[in-house]
Amino acid sequence: MAKTRPGVASKIKTGRKELDSYTIKGTNKVVRAGDCVLMRPSDAGKPPYVARVEKIEADARNNVKVHCRWYYRPEESLGGRRQFHGAKELFLSDHFDVQSAHTIEGKCIVHTFKNYTRLENVGAEDYYCRFEYKAATGAFTPDRVAVYCKCEMPYNPDDLMVQCEGCKDWYHPACVGMTIEEAKKLDHFVCAECSSDDDVKKSQNGFTSSPADDVKVRLSLFSHLLYRCSITYL
C-alpha cells in the first residue's frame, strides 16, 4: 500500500454503501469512523503508516475501502525530524486518501500532547500529536510552540528534564552541566540564575509532572525552530 500524493484523490466509484464498522482481517478488532489505525506500508522495511478513519464504504462485491486522513511522521514532513521530536510524535495532515481496508494492520491511539505526557506506561499503540501539518506547503498549526531550558527548545517527552524551584523553567541535564544519572537523584533543583536569589522557596518536591502541564511558558515561532535545528544538524 502506498499513499497517494496530496491533492490526488483515489477514484471513487458509484454504488458504494457506507458501513458503520469493519473488522480487521484475522482479528476481532473493530474499526469505526474516528478511530486511528496502522496501515501496511509499500516498503516492508518501514514502520506502518498511521491514519484516522473518516468513513468506511463497501461496493456491490463487498470490497471495503476506508476514507482516511494521514498522520505524518516528522521525517516525512518538509522540515524533517528534529531533536525535539519524540519517537511517537505525529502530525495530523490535510492529506486525505482512500485505501483498501485490507491494508489495515491494527488500531492505535493518537493522544493529545498533554494526555500523552501523563501516561504512566506508553504502549506500542500509543502516539501523540501537537501539530497539524499542511502537506503541500509544509506549514504547521499552531505556528508557535512552548520552549524551555537555556537551549529554548520544545519539550520532547522522551528526554528527562528537571524543573527549577525558583523560576519554574525546565532544563535538560546536559544544558546545566549534569548527567542524566545525577538528575534522577535530585530532590530539588535551582538553576544558576536563581541560585543567588534568597527568595527562592524550597518545597518538599519541586517537580511537577512534566513541562506540558505548565501554564506559564515561553513561545517561539515553530518555523524558526526548524531553521535553527537544521543548522545544528549540518
Curated annotation (Swiss-Prot):
PROSITE patterns the record matches: BAH, ZF_PHD_1, ZF_PHD_2
Chain intervals annotated as zinc finger (PHD-type): 146-197
Gene: EBS
Key words, A-Z: Chromatin regulator, Flowering, Metal-binding, Nucleus, Transcription, Transcription regulation, Zinc, Zinc-finger
Knocked-out gene: effects: Higher H3K9K14 acetylation in the genomic region of the FT locus leading to an enhanced accumulation. In ebs-2, acceleration of flowering associated with a shorter adult vegetative phase. Other developmental defects include smaller leaves and siliques, reduction in seed dormancy, plant size, and fertility, and partial suppression of LEAFY disruption (e.g. lfy-6) effects.
Chief location of this protein within or outside the cell: nucleus
Organism per entry: Arabidopsis thaliana (Mouse-ear cress)
Any one Gene Ontology molecular-function term assigned to this protein's record: histone H3K4me3 reader activity
Cellular component, GO, one term: nucleus
Function statement: Chromatin remodeling factor that binds to methylated histone (e.g. H3K4me2/3) to prevent their acetylation (e.g. H3K9K14Ac), likely by recruiting histone deacetylase (HDAC) complexes, and thus regulating the transcription of target genes. Negative regulator in developmental processes in a gibberellic acid- (GA-) dependent manner, such as germination, flowering induction, and flower organ specification, probably by modulating developmental gene expression. Involved in the chromatin-mediated repression of floral initiation and controls genes regulating flowering.
Domain BAH: 29-144
Cited InterPro entries: BAH_dom, BAH_sf, Zinc_finger_PHD-type_CS, Znf_FYVE_PHD, Znf_PHD, Znf_PHD-finger, Znf_RING/FYVE/PHD
Subcellular location: Nucleus
Tissue-by-tissue expression: Expressed ubiquitously, with higher levels in floral buds.
One example of a Gene Ontology biological process annotation: negative regulation of gene expression, epigenetic
Protein name (Swiss-Prot/TrEMBL): Chromatin remodeling protein EBS
Pfam family, one: PHD
Subunit structure: Recognizes di- and trimethylated histone H3 at lysine 4 (H3K4me2 and H3K4me3). Interacts with HDA6.
Family classification: Belongs to the SHL1/EBS protein family.
